[in-house]
Structures are given as structure tokens and as C-alpha cells.
């Protein structure tokens, strides 16, 4: 355990951030699974609304540096390709 007050505060801050980050990462994975499930079930309307929510979550995650912005762009692009190929 840290002996310095600022170090103790840093540990508390890190725990808080870690909890928030893991929650947001989990939310991203869950949303991706929901979109893929809707695509698999050929439910185009639901897949589209879920995809819009997913892209929003990705953009927010990129904005807060949870994931890199290019990583978010790549995930959006690949999911859009899957969505478009299922529509055809």
C-alpha cells in the first residue's frame, strides 16, 4: 500500500476509472453481439437500429480514449459491411 497521500488518491482514482472502463468495454461487446444476432436472424430493421446505437457507443469510447479512434472506425466499417451484405 502507498505511503504518500497523492499515491493513495491515485490508487482510488485508478480503481474508479478501471471500473468505468471495464463497464464501457463490456457494453461495447454486448452491443456488437446484439447487432450480429439481429443480422443472423435476418431482422434488418432491428439490426439497423442496433447498429446505430453501436456506432454511437464506439464514437463515445473513441472520444474518451477507451479505444483508439481508428479502432472504432475499423469496427464500424466491418459491422456495416456485414449489415449491407445481409441486406443484399
From Swiss-Prot:
Gene3D superfamilies: Ribosomal protein S20. The keyword Ribosomal protein applies. GO terms for cellular component: cytosol; small ribosomal subunit. InterPro entries: Ribosomal_bS20, Ribosomal_bS20_sf. Transmembrane segments: none annotated. Residues 1-31, 69-88 are annotated as: Disordered. GO terms for biological process: translation. Disulfide bonds: none annotated. GO terms for molecular function: small ribosomal subunit rRNA binding; structural constituent of ribosome. Residues 1-11 have a biased composition (Basic and acidic residues). Keywords: Ribonucleoprotein, Ribosomal protein, RNA-binding, rRNA-binding. Belongs to the bacterial ribosomal protein bS20 family. Binds directly to 16S ribosomal RNA. This is Small ribosomal subunit protein bS20. It comes from Leptospira interrogans serogroup Icterohaemorrhagiae serovar Lai (strain 56601). The gene is rpsT.
